[in-house]
UniProtKB/Swiss-Prot annotation:
Predominant localisation class: membrane
Gene3D superfamilies linked to this entry: N-terminal domain of the delta subunit of the F1F0-ATP synthase (1.10.520.20)
Membrane-related topology note: Peripheral membrane protein
GO MF, any single term: proton-transporting ATP synthase activity, rotational mechanism
Record protein name field: ATP synthase subunit delta
Record-stated family: Belongs to the ATPase delta chain family.
Chain's role: F(1)F(0) ATP synthase produces ATP from ADP in the presence of a proton or sodium gradient. F-type ATPases consist of two structural domains, F(1) containing the extramembraneous catalytic core and F(0) containing the membrane proton channel, linked together by a central stalk and a peripheral stalk. During catalysis, ATP synthesis in the catalytic domain of F(1) is coupled via a rotary mechanism of the central stalk subunits to proton translocation.
Cellular localization per UniProt: Cell membrane
InterPro entries named among the record's database cross-references: ATP_synth_OSCP/delta_N_sf (IPR026015), ATPase_OSCP/d_CS (IPR020781), ATPase_OSCP/dsu (IPR000711)
Lineage of the species this protein comes from: Bacteria, Pseudomonadati, Pseudomonadota, Alphaproteobacteria, Rickettsiales
UniProt key word Ion transport: yes
Family matches, as HAMAP family: ATP_synth_delta_bact (MF_01416)
Amino acid sequence: MKKTQYNNLVSSYARVLFHVSGSRLGIIRKEVEFLLAFFKDQRDVFVYLSHPMISFAHKKEVMLSINEHLSENLVKFIMVIFANKRSSLLILILEKFLSLARENENEFEITIKSAETLKESDIKIITESLSFLGKIIKVSNVVDPSILGGFVVRYGFNLIDASLKSYLDRLVDLSKMEILKVRNFV
């Protein structure tokens, strides 16, 4: 299966869980956060659950042992994933669901790429200027010397490029256009 097909499949399952959650979205969200943390701490459990040779009955048994922390709807949803032999995608589906839930609550994570590590005061200025978008729940500062200066902010599928590299690239493009104009008139 191609990567886009996997992404579509993951998104489809996540949207189903999102819509099924309805008025219980906050509760399901907390349970999904718990489950993801559990799988991160107990990696062996997820490896066991995602193994194709483990029977559906055994997977169901494991999920029912965790059931005291999960609502019936979430357990049933996970059982559908197991029945459809998509257990290896479970973590991706749950992460995508969290992304949809955050988007619904107007919460988002931002990544600030800069040529060097930013000071807290600089990060605060950037996050305050983006606060009109919603609640920023996580900020990551990634160092990339290739941007030369300035910064690039990514949130969701959006990008704000205030880097020196992109400015210089635009300047080069404008220069090329002007040279072509002059060449055409001569």
